Amino acid sequence: LGAFHGVPMTVKESYNVAGTPTTWGNPDWRDNVTQEDAECVKKLKSAGVNVFGKTNVPLSLADFQSYNEIYGTTNNPYDHERIPGGSSGGSAAALAAGLTGLEIGSDIGGSIRNPAHFCGVFGHKPTHDLLWLRGHSAPGDMRSTPDISVIGPLARSADDLYSAIKIMAGPDPIMSRGYQLNLPELGARSLADLKVGVW
């Protein structure tokens, strides 16, 4: 059995999950049903997760809220008058509402970090090239993603983030440049064990 055997999870709508629409919130792509899972989804499924749904995004992942004409508005589960952040706002809202225990988001300018903060959950924007981006691109877009674009997990605990990163990490044989995976074991167990740099 895999490390996440039986764990139910949702995935940000912009990821390919076989048999589901990947629209990036764009009505023009409403009928774009993907045939293959994104690489990170494959890795998590091989660890035993059960992907049972996809979560809302703003149009083209380009906003700090989570509204589009296809799926409507996602609100912050703690206060429906507030936004959950974006572009992984549906991901963070699903975690905060207790709908899911694990999520995958994406981040260029705060799209994991902002919703995690707004919804009181954990999110991690990892180092570029640590996790595979293939299967997370706009329909028909075969270009390489910008160097600042990464994917990463969201969860209800830092331990779950770390576990997900360990499963999802690894070189992409097509897109990665030089690659070396070296994730040390967690050393800090309390605030006294941490060093903080300020500049």
Positions of PLM-derived features:
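Gly/Ser-rich catalytic/binding loops embedded in alpha/beta enzyme cores
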Residues: 1-109
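A generic secondary-structure signal marking the coil-to-beta-strand transition
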Residues: 7, 47-48, 120, 192-195
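Electropositive phosphate-/nucleotide-binding environments in soluble metabolic enzymes
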Residues: 34-38, 121, 155-159
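Structural signature of FAD isoalloxazine-binding scaffolds in flavoprotein oxidoreductases
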Residues: 113-118
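A short helix-breaking turn/cap at a secondary-structure junction
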Residues: 125-199
